[in-house]
Amino acid sequence: MKPNLIKQKMLRGECTTNGWLSLGSSYSAELMGHAGFDSVTVDCQHGMFDFNQALPMLQALSATPTVPIVRAPWNDTAIIMHLLDAGAYGVICPMINNRAEAERLVGACRYAPAGMRSYGPARGLLYGGADYFDHANDTIVTFAMIETLEGIKNLDDILATPGLDGIYIGPNDLALVLGARPGTDLTDQRCIDMIAHILARAKHFNKFAGIFCASGAVGAIRRVQGFDLVTLTHEGSLLSNAAKAAVAAALAPPPAGSEPKVSTGY
């Protein structure tokens, strides 16, 4: 089976960079897959697309060096199995509140006897290889999102779930339940302290810790803090910011001495 390079890298103690897809475009998926990210996540929760658009995005990612993973829309066993059959090599699952929900996530990603995943890998077999069944349970990576008060309360129970590879922090939803505003994960002390607590507990249980970051600069901060996977915003934000910067540069006075010379012909 094709190896899961981000899982191998995290097991070596190295931080991985993760891209994020929200626009529903296989072309943007292909571009992000060639941008240097260790993995790229197809966001089926808040992304502007459904499964029929997620499939060609996963196909596009499969032709790039990156590892294709997904954020499931919910902790729904059938949906998670479908996304794995489509070729996802990892699942980030939102709103995990307790151990039972974490066990449901893990069970959907593992074939018996470790779980309840139904056999029918389809694209997973094409992408992963003929020996997919033999290695899928050890290759697929699972992340439970910690972003609710109940999830915080039951954090240790969630982290103790057999087969769960790690937790993933959704900083905006986490900020909301802590009484803070979205986007304040680096400035509101309640968010700062809680993120540090979640990271420390993940390390205690020897689990991976991932987090969504608003930019590459924030990703660098999280990498130094010890996170194993840092998501460097999403392609919609990257496109918007680059477009705004290009317009601003075009309307700004050119630097002194950079005026184009007038051509006088051949």
Place the predicted regions along the sequence by residue.
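Expand to "…catalyze enediolate/carbanion chemistry for C-C bond making/breaking, isomerization
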Residues: M1-Y266
